[in-house]
């Protein structure tokens, strides 16, 4: 409601030709007419009240963001819905900061793990051996990407995760070094969708089964002490 409309509803209507009517009345009647008009001292209060109403009136346009807004949604909850896979600048990607259910060999990752080393005595094709190990240790595996890149041979597979979700396993094999990332695609958030709940233990257990099947060397911080 505009300020003008608010004032029209609150202030009394201005009498028409008041000056002319008063000139035709007796002095006593003029005094009676003047006593019926609102005191001038009330006008500032009425104007302030009208301003307060117009400023505090509920406006849906102000309270609800436009659906056509071009600003991206940047909450951790919405960010976790967009899973980025593939190499980043020729390297395995780090774990997203919004996803605690992840392990990566990228050194910038918050949940870091050392790359695997293929023993010199292992003469089998590493990609074929990796595929066989994934199929024998993981549930319902599906190989999404198998490609040769300038940075090594890249493998991406989807496997069964917790519940009805699918987890992602990525590997980059370059000579005898294997970088990887294992990540859950379903992230649970604590109200109000700013803190992710969980840890990387599930992915670490998945990797342990895979590494035991491969027989490749997996360095740890404990083994370096």
Curated annotation (Swiss-Prot):
Alphabetic keyword roster: Chloroplast, Plastid, Thylakoid, Transit peptide
GO CC annotation terms, alphabetical: chloroplast; chloroplast thylakoid lumen; cytosol; thylakoid; thylakoid lumen
Protein's UniProt keywords contain Plastid: yes
InterPro entries, A to Z: Thylakoid_lumenal_17.9 (IPR037734)
Location (main, coarse): plastid
Keyword check for Protein biosynthesis: no
Signal peptide: none
Domain of life per record: Eukaryota
Protein location: Plastid, Chloroplast thylakoid lumen
Name recorded for this polypeptide: Thylakoid lumenal 17.9 kDa protein, chloroplastic
